[in-house]
Each structure stands twice: as C-alpha cells, then as structure tokens.
Swiss-Prot record:
It comes from Treponema denticola (strain ATCC 35405 / DSM 14222 / CIP 103919 / JCM 8153 / KCTC 15104). GO terms for cellular component: ribonucleoprotein complex; ribosome. Its cofactor is Zn(2+). It comes from the Bacteria. This is Large ribosomal subunit protein bL31. The gene is rpmE. Zn(2+) binds at C16, C18, C36, C39. Gene3D superfamilies: Ribosomal protein L31. Binds the 23S rRNA.
C-alpha cells in the first residue's frame, strides 16, 4: 500500500435510535442509524408501526380509493 493516501481505519461507535450502541471499526468516526438488530421487526418478531398512516391516507385520497 502507498503511504498517506488511505483514510484512517479507527474505532467507531454505531448508535441506533433505540439506544443500542455497537462498537466496530470504520473510516467514519460516528454512525447513527434508525434501525438495528435489537429493534428490527425481523429479529425481534414484533411488528413495529412506522409512520406511514399519513402517506397511506394521502395515497388513497389522491387515487379516490375507498376502504
């Protein structure tokens, strides 16, 4: 490898919106994510309601879809 052309590979903290913190290595100092393996519905087995109610209502209104 050539010297001084590659970014530094450092300890990194990945922080999830649920509060889970993961330490890993990356060229990025701090990473913030919205969903991790501790809160993702696939891994937890729980259904998590994402803020889509407004989008669904707007879609139905736009295309005149009745329930």
């Amino acid at each position: 490898m050539k010297k001084d052309i590659h970014p530094k590979y450092e300890e990194t903290t990945v922080t999830c919106a649920c509060g889970n913190v993961i330490n890993t290595r990356s060229t990025v100092k701090d990473i913030k994510v919205e969903i991790c393996s501790q809160c993702h519905p696939f891994f937890t087995g729980k259904q998590k309601l994402v803020d889509t109610a407004g989008r669904i209502d707007r879609f139905k209104k736009r295309y005149n879809i009745k329930d």
